[in-house]
Amino acid sequence: GFLTAEEKGLVNGLWGKVNVDEVGGEALGRLLVVYPWTQRFFQSFGDLSSADAIMHNSKVKAHGKKVLNSFSDGLKHVDDLKGTFAKLSELHCDKLHVDPENFKLLGNVLVCVLAHHFGKEFTPQVQAAYQKVVAGVASALAHRYH
């Protein structure tokens, strides 16, 4: 596996305290605010006219929750991310034509949100482990492009 046993422990230890629904909506919302060009994939989501509108948009929250539940699933199969995300990779790459760079951006935003929520608990070691995970997930999602 690409994570050491210690890194897995750090990742799972923190993940057990994550409110997946809340953090998912916040991460996706921030992605759309901070990197506005990502909004073009969400035109059917209604009002994305301001940061406030985005952060309170129920469709953004719902999709963010879905995204983070998939991520949660990935953490259970961290040694087979390609397999775990094969179907989602197909959907996002072949059908939706999402630029794979966006998966990396969302991963980095997720790390920011976790740091924001957990403060001192989000140590450099924990961050390093999470950066590895989000990079692995982004790469698994971009798999169909390679």
From Swiss-Prot:
GO biological process: hydrogen peroxide catabolic process
SUPFAM superfamilies: Globin-like
Molecular function GO labels: haptoglobin binding; heme binding; hemoglobin alpha binding; metal ion binding; organic acid binding; oxygen binding; oxygen carrier activity; peroxidase activity
Residues binding heme b, per UniProt: H63, H92
Residue positions where N6-acetyllysine is found in the record: K59, K82
Tissue/organ expression: Red blood cells.
Keyword Transport (UniProt): yes
Superkingdom: Eukaryota
Coiled coil (UniProt feature): none
Residues with PTM Phosphoserine: S44
Modification type S-nitrosocysteine: residues: C93
A GO CC term attached to the entry: blood microparticle
Pfam families, per the entry: Globin
Keyword terms: Acetylation, Heme, Iron, Metal-binding, Oxygen transport, Phosphoprotein, S-nitrosylation, Transport
PANTHER family attached to this UniProt entry: HEMOGLOBIN FAMILY MEMBER (PTHR11442), HEMOGLOBIN SUBUNIT BETA (PTHR11442:SF42)
Subunit architecture: Heterotetramer of two alpha chains and two beta chains.
Protein name as it appears in the record: Hemoglobin subunit beta
Gene field: HBB
